[in-house]
Amino acid sequence: MSGNSNDKTHDIWNGEAGKDWAENQRDLDDFLRDAMDQLLAQLPLSPGMRVLEIGSGSGTMSMEMARTVGDKGYVIGLDVSKELLALARRRVKAAALDNAAFRDLDIQTQALDEAGFDICTAQFGMMFFSDPVLALQNIRAHLTQGARVAFNGWADAGNPWFSIPLRIAETYLGPLEQEPNDGAPAPGPLAFSDVSYVTEILAEAGYADIEGWRSEIMIRHPKGLEALMHSIQYVGPISTLYRLKSPDEATRAKIAGDIRKEFTRFVQPDGSVAMPGLVSMYRCLAP
């Protein structure tokens, strides 16, 4: 299997992004828990199923699914970040989950040895392909007839956790400019925001019974505002802006101070943080 290069995504996730996510895995799991629970609710998981996860990251959702499908089923997670793959493998070993494995593989350009998957899913893992139609076609080649596919992506509105930090950061650093991608959204956190666009490319890639919708989530951080301030550096457009602009520590401190002031309203009486979020959800079948 071959295809267009996805080298830029590989470089990002094998640089600071992958390292940062690995180091902050527990906090980010808390941060994204509601989104993951909503996605898992779209999957008809049962014992014995074979599951493929795209962009499996630190392995959190793969581990949840492995427990559900049991010893007669299995989960294979794909990622391109060596740092996150190493962490995921350590975690499944520590949890004695022998039915979960992880592959260093880009499904846009490479074939997986295994096939015949009953389910394919991705928790914010589909939107980093430079050629998403090709990637989706290659995924379909690994699925059984009638396999369920469900995944999510960030919506372009309704997410104060990244719209507020991005607006503030851009006042100091200038706008986040996206590189051209032949008229399609550039790979990144918002690439699969547009429901019409994503349902169209799913149809082009050969899927059936395609549905797309927006879903409200709650983004929570039980450790409080300062922990959230730390996490937002690694999730969403502000992380991209920081990588591109390389602000010095003094500028980062000013940005953080302004963000903190606006985020204070989301602090709960128990000291935790809860704020609304919005995701784009998708599901379809492999014909």
At which residue positions do the language-model features occur?
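A short acidic, Gly/Pro-enriched loop at the edge of an enzyme's catalytic core
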Residues: 108-119
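Conserved class I S-adenosyl-L-methionine
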Residues: 2-49, 60-64, 87
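C-terminal helical/coil "lid" or tail adjacent to the Rossmann-like core of SAM-dependent
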Residues: 2-6, 10, 17-24, 210-269
